[in-house]
């Protein structure tokens, strides 16, 4: 009996309408509110350029005292100035292909296209979070290098509640803006041992979310600072803006008759156009459309520059652990 081939069941238009069970939008990170989809970033992602400038109005200077009104017509009030600034956003052009041998189990399912779509959903979710955490590491590294680390506190050998509190209050009276925390598994272990973690459970008692002071806590072992040291990141509401473009061919199935030593080979590929923009920071890296940065390059201090004042930036961090040679 002949086995099912990808080409036997693949219908591009139908495939494109399927929602992956594990799409980025369904992750706890996205649902926490720290990432906000932006129509502006959607439009930029669709413009076909590697980078674009985003203009914004700077806040009025609250340190300027108001004029004192009088009845003297010649007493002219001082006029303040509203100024614009700009930041650069980087578009990511990404793709991934799976060969038919990678999808054998999915082809055996009663809904093979949905299962294949779910496989891609899981893949993109992991990549998406790597870029997000990479950007978080990069902007903190940039803050230390360029701004004297005014968003960062050092906890010493082990994490503590005091260190978390001190980090949050680097934002002064805006400290209540933080809505989620990302930590390394070593730090999470320390938090659990110190009874800092509370858990949300579903109706069956299954843990669905770990929290600290009501804030979701996410584990990612990419959150290191140096050998032996860890980076815990605070994210505020809307910490990242998110946009998605329209690849010319977002999904494509290719069959190569000569592949497989003449037995035929099939590859299903997806293409993504993303923007993930940390609030208050401007991209300083490569602008080449054909050289999209990797998640590791997102984590480089040299690729980011803060353009907002400290209190307007929804990020803070704690460094913990003991550096090893």
Predicted regions and their residues:
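N-terminal "assembly arms/tails" that initiate or stabilize quaternary assembly
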Residues: 1-89, 293, 302-325
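Extended, compositionally biased alpha-helical segments that mediate assembly or anchoring
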Residues: 2-8, 239, 243-325
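Long, contiguous amphipathic alpha-helices that act as assembly "spine/axial" helices in icosahedral shell
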Residues: 54, 83-145, 176-182, 186, ...
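Alpha-helical scaffold segments that mediate packing/assembly in large oligomeric complexes
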Residues: 102-173, 293, 297-314, 320-324
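Short helix/loop capping segments that flank catalytic or ligand/cofactor-binding pockets
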Residues: 62-65, 108, 190-193, 199-200, ...
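Extended serine/threonine-enriched, polar tracts that run as long, contiguous segments within proteins
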Residues: 185-188, 196, 203-267, 271-272
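Short, cationic low-complexity segments
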Residues: 77-83, 206-216, 220, 289-307
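Extended, solvent-exposed, turn-rich assembly/linker loops in the middle of proteins
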Residues: 141-216
């Amino acid at each position: 009996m002949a086995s099912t081939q990808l080409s036997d069941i693949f219908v591009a238009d139908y495939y494109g309408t399927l929602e992956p069970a594990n799409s980025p939008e369904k992750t706890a990170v996205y649902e926490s509110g720290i990432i906000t989809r932006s129509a502006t970033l959607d439009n930029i992602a669709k413009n076909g350029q590697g980078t674009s400038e985003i203009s914004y109005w700077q806040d009025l200077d609250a340190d300027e005292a108001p004029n004192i009104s009088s009845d003297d017509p010649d007493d002219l009030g001082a006029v303040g100035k509203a100024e614009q600034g700009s930041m650069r956003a980087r578009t990511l052009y990404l793709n991934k292909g799976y060969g038919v041998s990678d999808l054998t189990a999915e082809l055996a399912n009663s809904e093979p296209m949905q299962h294949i779509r779910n496989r891609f959903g899981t893949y993109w979710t992991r990549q998406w979070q790597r870029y997000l955490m990479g950007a978080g590491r990069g902007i903190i590294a940039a803050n230390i290098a360029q701004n004297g680390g005014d968003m960062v506190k050092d906890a010493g050998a082990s994490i503590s509640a005091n260190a978390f509190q001190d980090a949050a209050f680097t934002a002064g009276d805006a400290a209540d803006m933080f809505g989620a925390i990302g930590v390394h598994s070593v730090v999470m272990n320390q938090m659990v041992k110190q009874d800092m973690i509370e858990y949300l459970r579903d109706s069956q008692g299954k843990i669905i979310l770990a929290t600290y002071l009501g804030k979701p806590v996410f584990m990612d072992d990419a959150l290191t600072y140096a050998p032996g040291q860890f980076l815990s990141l605070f994210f505020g509401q809307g910490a990242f803006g998110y946009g998605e473009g329209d690849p010319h061919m977002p999904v494509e199935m290719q069959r190569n008759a000569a592949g497989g030593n003449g037995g035929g080979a099939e590859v299903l590929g997806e293409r993504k156009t993303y923007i993930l923009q940390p609030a208050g920071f401007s991209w300083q890296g490569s602008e080449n459309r054909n050289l999209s940065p990797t998640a590791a390059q997102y984590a480089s201090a040299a690729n980011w520059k803060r353009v907002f004042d400290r209190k307007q930036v929804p990020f803070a961090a704690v460094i913990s652990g003991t550096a090893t040679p």
